[in-house]
C-alpha cells in the first residue's frame, strides 16, 4: 500500500483552495443523496452497518477502503443494483432529492435512468459506436433522428471522445481501445441525462494514460452531474474527489472533505489505512 503525501494536497493546490462544505449541515438544496441508517444483509451476513451520510450535488464523492469493506455494496445500493442479488435485504433509506428510492412505489427502471452506473471493465454492446450511445434513448422511446444525433454528439463531447470517433460513428464499438471503450460507456450513461453518475473503479482495467484521461473527464463531469466513485487507488481519490468516505468492515469510519481526510484524519483507523499500515 502506498501512503498519500500531504504535499499532494498542500495549501495552494487546486484541491486545497476549493471551498469546503460542512457535510454535517448541508441545506436541502445542496444535497443530491441523503443516506439514513442504511443496513444491508446478504442472507444473515451484514454488509453495511447503519450508514448515514449526505452526498452533495455537483461534486465528486469517493468511497475508499480495503477489499470487502462495503464500498461497492454501498455504491450499488444507490441505484438498487443489489436488488438483483439473491437473498439481499435492506433497511433504512436513501433519498434522492428528498424521495426514498426504496419506497415500494418507486419505478426502479426510472430510478436507474436518474442514477447511471459505469463498471470496472468497459462493457460496450456489440453495436456501432453511435448505437451504443443512443441505446438508452431508444429504449425510452426516442426515435427522432435529429434528436438522437444531437444527443450522441453532445454525450461523446462530454465524454471527451467525439474528436476521436466522429468519423467512424457507424463502426463497431468493439474496435475501440480499452480507454476509449470506457469513455464510450460513460457517454452511453450520460446520454439519458442522469442526475447522479456512479463509477465503480472505472480505471482499474486501464493503462496509466487512459486512467489520466478518465480522471480529467471526471473533473469535467461534475459540472453537469453529481459523481460518486469507488476506488482502491487512494491517490486517485485524492486527485479527483471533493470529499471522501472511508469504510471498513461495513462501517462508515470517517467522511469529510478530501483534503482533511488525507492530511489530518480524525480516526486512527483512517490514518492507519491511508499510511499503509493495513489494507
Curated annotation (Swiss-Prot):
The reply to whether Cell inner membrane figures as a keyword in the UniProt entry is yes
Localization, per the record, is:
Cell inner membrane
**Cross-referenced InterPro entries, in alphabetical order?**
AAA+_ATPase (IPR003593), ABC_transporter-like_ATP-bd (IPR003439), ABC_transporter-like_CS (IPR017871), P-loop_NTPase (IPR027417), PstB-like (IPR005670)
GO terms for molecular function, please?
A: ATP binding; ATP hydrolysis activity; ATPase-coupled phosphate ion transmembrane transporter activity
GO terms for CC? plasma membrane
| Keyword Translocase annotated | yes
Biological-process GO terms, alphabetical: phosphate ion transmembrane transport
Per the record, the similarity remark reads: Belongs to the ABC transporter superfamily. Phosphate importer (TC 3.A.1.7) family.
Q: Give a short account of what the protein does.
A: Part of the ABC transporter complex PstSACB involved in phosphate import. Responsible for energy coupling to the transport system.
Q: Quote the protein name from its UniProt record.
A: Phosphate import ATP-binding protein PstB
Species of provenance: Colwellia psychrerythraea (strain 34H / ATCC BAA-681)
Amino acid at each position: 500500500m502506498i501512503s498519500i503525501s500531504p504535499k499532494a494536497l498542500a495549501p495552494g493546490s487546486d484541491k486545497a483552495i476549493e471551498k469546503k462544505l460542512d457535510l454535517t449541515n448541508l441545506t436541502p438544496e445542496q444535497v443530491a443523496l441523503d443516506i439514513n441508517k442504511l443496513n444491508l444483509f446478504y442472507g444473515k451476513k451484514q454488509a453495511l452497518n447503519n450508514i448515514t451520510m449526505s452526498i452533495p450535488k455537483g461534486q465528486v464523492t469517493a468511497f475508499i477502503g480495503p477489499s470487502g469493506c462495503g464500498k461497492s455494496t454501498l455504491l450499488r445500493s444507490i441505484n438498487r443494483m443489489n436488488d438483483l442479488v439473491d437473498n439481499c435485504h435492506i433497511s433504512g433509506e436513501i433519498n434522492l432529492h428528498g424521495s426514498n428510492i426504496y419506497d415500494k412505489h418507486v419505478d426502479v427502471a426510472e430510478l436507474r435512468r436518474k442514477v447511471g452506473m459505469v463498471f470496472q471493465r468497459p462493457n460496450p454492446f456489440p453495436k456501432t459506436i453511435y448505437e451504443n450511445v443512443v441505446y438508452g434513448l431508444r429504449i425510452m422511446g426516442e426515435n427522432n433522428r435529429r434528436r438522437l444525433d444531437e444527443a450522441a454528439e453532445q454525450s461523446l463531447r462530454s465524454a471527451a471522445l467525439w474528436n476521436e470517433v466522429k468519423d467512424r460513428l457507424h463502426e463497431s464499438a468493439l474496435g475501440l481501445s480499452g480507454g476509449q471503450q470506457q469513455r464510450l460507456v460513460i457517454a452511453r450513461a450520460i446520454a439519458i441525462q442522469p442526475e447522479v453518475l456512479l463509477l465503480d473503479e472505472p480505471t482499474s482495467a486501464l493503462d496509466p494514460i487512459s486512467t489520466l484521461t478518465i480522471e480529467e473527464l471526471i473533473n469535467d463531469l461534475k459540472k453537469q452531474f453529481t459523481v460518486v466513485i469507488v476506488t482502491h487507488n487512494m491517490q486517485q481519490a485524492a486527485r479527483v474527489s471533493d470529499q471522501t468516505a472511508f469504510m471498513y468492515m461495513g462501517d462508515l469510519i470517517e467522511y469529510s472533505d478530501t483534503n482533511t481526510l488525507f492530511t489530518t484524519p480524525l480516526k486512527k483507523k483512517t490514518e492507519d489505512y491511508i499510511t499503509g499500515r493495513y489494507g
